[in-house]
């Protein structure tokens, strides 16, 4: 891998989307933990993931401005609430509908959505939602193909899986290449993934309604 930079701020050509696309060339799996997710962000990276075997996206469910503001204002009850499965599915449905209706670039969203659905149906991609509304972590984990000199790498920081987070906003993200960092991040992701709710089919149903 030619890019040895550790920090990505979306300035001067070091946007996070470009690094994701570079690392995807070497990856057999890609795991994402993101508080916010929009299909326009997925559009920025999906082409490089064509040869990736497995993609898992774990999202928070506090994905609208109103809820995010409430949490930032210290609404402890809202922050700590654990939702049941029907409530999680309803929130995901609301999020997808809102994006489709309010996106500034509906064509990009549409292209990202079509690929997203295709990969869900093939089993390549699974999206889950964490049932607690206090998850705001951002984590990108690549597991490399066998024979690579490293097992994997991790990027963590401020960027959500959105076009703004990957390209437009001033962000601060760091790549961690140490094996111990990769293993720690992978283990924590697996813990959260196990306790999360599969919303893949709800995503497809909402888009196709």
Set out the residue ranges of the language-model regions.
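PLD/PLD-like phosphodiesterase catalytic module centered on the HKD motif
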Residues: 1-209
């Amino acid at each position: 891998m030619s890019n040895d930079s550790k920090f990505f701020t979306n300035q001067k050509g070091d946007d996070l989307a470009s690094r994701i696309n570079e690392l995807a060339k070497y990856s057999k799996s890609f795991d994402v933990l993101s508080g916010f997710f929009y299909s326009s962000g997925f559009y920025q990276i999906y082409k490089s993931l064509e040869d990736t075997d497995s993609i898992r996206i774990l999202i928070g469910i506090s994905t609208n401005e109103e809820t995010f503001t409430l949490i930032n204002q210290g609404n402890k009850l809202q922050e700590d609430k654990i939702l049941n499965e029907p409530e999680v599915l309803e929130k995901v449905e609301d999020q997808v509908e809102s994006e489709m209706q309010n996106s500034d670039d509906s064509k990009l969203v549409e292209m990202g959505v079509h690929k997203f659905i295709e990969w869900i149906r093939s089993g390549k991609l699974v999206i889950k939602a964490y049932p607690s509304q206090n998850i705001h972590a951002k984590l990108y984990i690549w597991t490399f193909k066998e024979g690579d000199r490293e097992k994997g790498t991790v990027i963590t920081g401020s960027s959500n899986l959105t076009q703004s987070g990957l390209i437009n906003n001033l962000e601060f993200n760091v790549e961690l290449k140490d094996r111990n960092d990769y293993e720690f991040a992978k283990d924590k992701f697996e813990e959260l993934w196990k306790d999360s709710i599969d919303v893949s089919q709800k995503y497809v149903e909402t888009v196709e309604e």
